[in-house]
């Protein structure tokens, strides 16, 4: 083994995300001398990231080298780790298209990156590019491990392991560890005192056990405390990012009904189910404080904040950041050194969760060490949780089949099976919506869709 790994970042123009991941990497002793290859098709954004990464590296006392690439295969050559984080079509035009076309057809969305027409279109735009990365990896770094952060996570991960089963990859999200920290904050307890077991699908996994350590070293179930805090109006706390639009009511109400807390945010969960966003039901939007059009608003704000941050980074002598909650550096360190760690990853369901479809993409705890990323068996999850997940897996199954077999009919079927879409639109309206989305996206979508 070489003394230091090569880490390739595809989509390195996502500077804020690069900063978080590589800020963690540079503080790990075994990774300090890594060769970091930054790749993006946008040369301006690439140069911005280079400035930030160089200062991060110097500030952390890391001694590796940085190379910048607009050619993907060159960036991937002999890589040990491949971090993927990009958005095909960006906020403009593609995200705007997903929201505006759906709205014209009477379908409101909040985030639109995981399920529903927005998630379906994003998958169709994204998967061909992920496949090209797999092709290049097969040729120039076949032993590398891909750490995929691109949404829609389940469909993307599924499409890659279905077509390129030899590529070592895991889909990563921060919702499991992020929500655990959020719940600890709601109860004014130290996140380090938590112990939990979580399982499901990406953006719809549930804490099957959620406990905290007491003074005498024993663990107690945290759910009764959490429910009492919500009923007393003491939880949830105001949004940690200062976003007053996102008040987390949906998840707590679902917790009361289901008995288990879900990992992804209220604004996400509201559009994965048929109960919260309906035509003419402004009362539901008000009661559950559902932030419609949240993702476009967030994109505009983040872009404005980034320009301000970038100017500060350009003039700063040092860039010092706190550790992020992302798993990437933990995985790299465990694979490179053999020092074991546990992360939550999105992987193929091969006997991991018994009552979800085998072959579907599930999110479970994984042991990571020199043997690789090893998912752990969960067994059977509560039937009502599995039933809810199945409604989302239906969409993922059909969309993945659509793109693997180039079958346009399955795209309509995937949209028909989406719980939120089906609760709002009739069948003919769903077909018309899909037709308009395909026409509006044009060349951003695969050619077979437009034949």
Question: Which functions belong to the PLM regions below?
Answer:
Residues 7-32:
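N-terminal Rossmann-like dinucleotide-binding module
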Residues 65-78:
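Short acidic low-complexity segments
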Residues 188-451:
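Long, compositionally biased stretches enriched for glycine and/or charged residues
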Residues 92-163:
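Rossmann-fold NAD(P)-binding glycine/threonine-rich loop
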Residues 77, 83-84, 148-149:
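Redox-cofactor binding/interface segments in oxidoreductases and associated redox assembly factors
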Residues 132-214:
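Internal, well-ordered domain-core segments that constitute the primary functional module
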Residues 30-54:
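NAD(P)-binding Rossmann-fold cofactor-contacting core
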Residues 29-31, 56-63, 164-165, 187-189:
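Short helix-capping segments at alpha-helix termini
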């Amino acid at each position: 083994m070489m003394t230091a790994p090569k880490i390739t970042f595809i989509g390195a123009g996502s500077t804020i995300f690069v900063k978080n991941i590589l800020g963690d990497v540079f503080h790990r002793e075994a990774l300090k001398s890594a060769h970091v290859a930054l790749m993006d098709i946008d040369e301006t954004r690439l140069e911005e990231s280079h400035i930030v990464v160089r200062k991060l590296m110097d500030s952390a006392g890391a001694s590796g080298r940085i190379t910048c690439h607009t050619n993907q295969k060159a960036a991937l050559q002999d890589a040990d780790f491949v971090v993927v984080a990009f958005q095909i079509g960006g906020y403009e035009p593609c995200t705007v298209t997903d929201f505006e076309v759906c709205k014209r057809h009477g379908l409101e969305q909040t985030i639109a990156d995981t399920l529903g027409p927005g998630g379906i279109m994003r998958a169709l735009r994204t998967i061909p590019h992920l496949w090209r990365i797999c092709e290049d990896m097969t040729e120039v770094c076949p032993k590398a491990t891909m750490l995929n952060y691109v949404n829609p996570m389940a469909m993307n991960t599924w499409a890659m392991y279905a077509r390129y089963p030899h590529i070592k990859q895991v889909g990563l999200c921060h919702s499991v560890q992020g929500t655990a920290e959020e719940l600890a904050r709601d109860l004014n307890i130290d996140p380090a005192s938590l112990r939990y077991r979580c399982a499901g699908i990406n953006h719809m996994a549930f804490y099957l056990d959620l406990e905290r350590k007491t003074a005498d070293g024993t663990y107690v179930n945290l759910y009764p405390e959490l429910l009492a805090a919500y009923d007393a109006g003491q939880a949830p706390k105001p949004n940690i990012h200062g976003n007053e639009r996102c008040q987390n009511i949906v998840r707590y109400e679902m917790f009361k009904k289901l008995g288990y807390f879900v990992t992804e945010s209220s604004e996400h969960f509201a559009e994965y189910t048929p109960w919260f966003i309906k035509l003419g039901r402004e009362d539901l939007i008000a009661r559950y404080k559902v932030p419609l059009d949240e993702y476009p608003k967030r994109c505009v704000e983040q872009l404005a904040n980034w320009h301000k941050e970038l100017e500060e980074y350009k003039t700063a002598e040092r860039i010092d950041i706190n550790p992020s909650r992302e798993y990437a550096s933990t995985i790299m360190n465990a694979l490179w050194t053999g020092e074991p760690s546990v992360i939550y990853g999105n992987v193929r369901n091969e006997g991991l969760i018994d009552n979800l479809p085998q072959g579907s993409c599930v999110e479970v705890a994984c042991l990571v060490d020199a043997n690789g990323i090893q998912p752990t068996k969960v067994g059977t999850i509560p039937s009502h949780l599995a039933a809810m997940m199945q409604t989302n897996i239906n969409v993922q199954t059909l969309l993945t089949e659509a793109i693997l077999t180039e079958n346009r009919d399955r795209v309509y079927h995937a949209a028909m099976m989406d719980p939120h879409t089906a609760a709002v639109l009739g069948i003919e309206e769903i077909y018309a919506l899909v037709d308009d989305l395909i026409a509006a996206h044009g060349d951003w979508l695969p050619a077979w869709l437009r034949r």
